[in-house]
Regions:
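N-terminal loops that bind phosphate or other acidic moieties
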Residues: 1-213
Length: 213
């Protein structure tokens, strides 16, 4: 089984929907340890992506991801814009020319995307950032890709690993970004970036389950 271009476009539409639905939650999470703009910034970015999709719907998946990355860089403020922009730009570079993605393709694209975020943000696991959701998700996906199991359970396991990573940020003391200025006071709060990352990966699992029903 593979993820088609249509699946990819639907995933991006679902990303926009889930970010809009959780806009206020992301704002509240960011208000506790940041500057309260993550929800609004992410919503603005993915609404821009949504408007862009009709123009790029006939492109290959790599070109679609690159266009998404550019849209996010130009419309999402704060640290999230460059980081999520890099995420999609790196995924786009690895999927150039493809009109469908196998599980190994998706795993490799996610790995390139996460590595791009690491290089751009210079964060490490446990720093209380989006990486604390993305890295467990990537490891889960790689295990499924190596074992040759199905795409649907792989995406669901990846989303669940991201959820657990997101929750694991609650007791952490932030070592990156505005939250790090709070020191010990940043503990006890869920990281908004890890939360938005989980939402995007959950949307991927939900999209595939809907398309394969």
């Amino acid at each position: 089984m593979t993820l088609s271009r249509e699946d990819t476009l639907q995933w991006l539409k679902n990303c926009a929907a889930v970010i809009a639905e959780n806009r206020e939650t992301l704002i509240e999470l960011d208000a506790a340890i940041g500057d309260a703009d993550h929800g609004a910034n992410m919503d603005r970015g993915f609404q821009a992506v949504l408007k862009k999709l009709p123009e790029i719907a006939d492109k290959d998946i790599g070109s679609i991801f690159k266009a998404v990355g550019m849209a996010l860089v130009s419309t999402v403020g704060g640290a999230a814009g460059p980081l999520y922009g890099t995420f999609f730009l790196q995924a786009g570079a690895l999927t150039a020319g493809k009109t469908e993605l196998s599980l190994p393709d998706w795993s490799a694209a996610l790995e390139a995307a996460v590595n791009g975020v690491i290089l751009r943000g210079k964060a490490s696991p446990g720093d209380k950032t989006m990486l604390d959701a993305l890295l467990p998700a990537l490891e889960a996906l790689k295990k499924f890709a190596e074992s040759g199991e199905g795409l649907a359970p792989a995406l669901r396991a990846s989303a669940e690993a991201a959820r657990q990573g997101m929750l694991a940020t609650i007791p952490l003391v932030a070592r990156k970004g505005r939250a790090s200025y709070l020191g010990e006071r940043s503990a006890g709060h869920q990281d908004p970036g890890a939360t938005s990352s989980y939402l995007l990966l959950k949307a991927a699992a939900d999209t595939w389950e809907s398309s394969s029903d």
